[in-house]
């Protein structure tokens, strides 16, 4: 249904932006790669890439506290996001944001319970992309 809706919106001239998240429960690096392939077929105009964070007061916090979810390390989140970023940009899809905006609400004391948060996450991803294999 989602693929059909995106195609229909594009037919009517809408600019399509997609948001991709790494580190979702049950997600593997292989499933991230498969998602990127689907996104490339959809051909959005732009995309955003975010790592999943455990935020205070959310259902995910309770799942995390019960030990049923382990967030990505910062290193794994950077590597997976760099893969997504490089694939999208090589395909001509503009990536307009990588990582969450480090605002006062998000960065308030105790708001981020766990996960790969870094105020310069996007720069880490771009640096990773520029490293030699």
Name each model feature, range by range.
Residues 1-133:
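C-terminal scaffold of the Radical SAM
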């Amino acid at each position: 249904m989602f693929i059909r809706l995106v195609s229909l919106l594009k037919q009517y001239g809408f600019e399509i932006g997609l948001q991709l998240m790494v580190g979702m429960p049950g997600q593997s690096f292989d499933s991230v790669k498969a998602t990127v392939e689907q996104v490339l077929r959809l051909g959005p105009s732009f995309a955003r890439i975010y790592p999943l964070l455990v935020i205070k007061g959310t259902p995910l916090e309770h799942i995390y506290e019960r030990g049923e979810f382990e967030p990505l390390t910062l290193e794994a989140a950077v590597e997976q996001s760099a893969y997504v970023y490089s694939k999208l940009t090589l395909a001509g899809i503009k990536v307009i944001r990588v990582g969450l905006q480090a605002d006062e609400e998000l960065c308030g004391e105790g708001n981020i319970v766990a996960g790969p948060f870094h105020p310069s996450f996007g720069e880490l991803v771009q640096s990773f992309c520029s490293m030699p294999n």
